[in-house]
């Protein structure tokens, strides 16, 4: 998102949401009412959490609706309802209100707060995905480096290049890796 050309207001909103996500608490502009009558108190601090597989399953089930068609009853899933169900489950708390929020509470948000919350959860998801990609990418890079080292070792020992070793079927490649490991101990 940083690479896009955002207008000054959009960039300011983006930067404030990023800073708040990093601090662990997102601030609502207008707040969410808690309580009734004179006892109503506005809640502003939102804590987000990662969705679980159970959250995703529950959101999908909640987004489905049974409708009648010419062929009989059919389950239809609403993408917008799925998004709302995921959003409400991703909210750990808003002030003293524990999540997941009910749809009735989501409806009480101002348009600005709803949009801010939607953007924040999207950015939060992107940050989580990026961190997972970096972790897994690092694992893949280490694995790839190990494979290339093993292929080079096999190529040196068998007097051919690493390309030959990498073109082998995996079972033969790993068998040669084991042989190269054993042989390299004797060639030191």
Curated annotation (Swiss-Prot):
Gene Ontology cellular component terms for the protein in this record: host cell cytoplasm
A family per Pfam: Gp41_Mu
Entry's localization field: Host cytoplasm
Record InterPro entries: Tail_Gp41-like
Annotated function: Required for tail assembly. Together with gp41, may act as a chaperone promoting the assembly of the tape measure protein (TMP) and the tail tube protein (TTP) into a functional tail shaft (Potential).
Coiled-coil segments on the chain, per record: none
Name of the protein in question: Probable tail assembly protein FS-gp41
Main location as per UniProt: host cell
Spans through the membrane: none
UniProtKB keywords: Host cytoplasm, Late protein, Viral release from host cell, Viral tail assembly
GO BP terms: viral tail assembly; viral translational frameshifting
Domain of life: Viruses
Organism field: Escherichia phage Mu (Bacteriophage Mu)
Family: Belongs to the mulikevirus tail assembly protein family.
Expression induction or repression: Expressed in the late phase of the viral replicative cycle. Expression of late genes is activated by the viral late transcription activator C.
């Amino acid at each position: 998102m940083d690479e896009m050309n955002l207008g000054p207001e959009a960039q300011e909103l983006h930067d404030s949401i990023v800073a708040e996500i990093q601090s662990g608490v997102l601030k609502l502009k207008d707040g969410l009412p808690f309580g009734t009558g004179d006892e109503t108190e506005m809640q502003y601090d939102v804590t987000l959490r990662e969705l679980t597989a159970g959250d995703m399953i529950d959101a999908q089930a909640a987004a489905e609706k049974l409708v009648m068609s010419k062929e009989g009853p059919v389950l239809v899933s609403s993408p917008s309802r799925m998004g709302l169900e995921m959003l409400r489950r991703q909210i750990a708390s808003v002030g003293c209100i524990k999540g997941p929020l009910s749809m009735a509470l989501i409806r009480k948000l101002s348009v600005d707060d709803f949009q801010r919350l939607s953007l924040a959860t999207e950015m939060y998801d992107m940050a989580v995905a990026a961190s997972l990609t970096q972790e897994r990418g690092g694992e893949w890079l280490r694995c790839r480096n190990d494979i290339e080292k093993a292929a080079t070792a096999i190529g040196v020992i068998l007097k051919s290049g690493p390309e030959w070793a990498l073109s082998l079927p995996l079972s033969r490649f790993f068998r040669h890796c084991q042989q190269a490991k054993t042989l390299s101990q004797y060639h030191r």
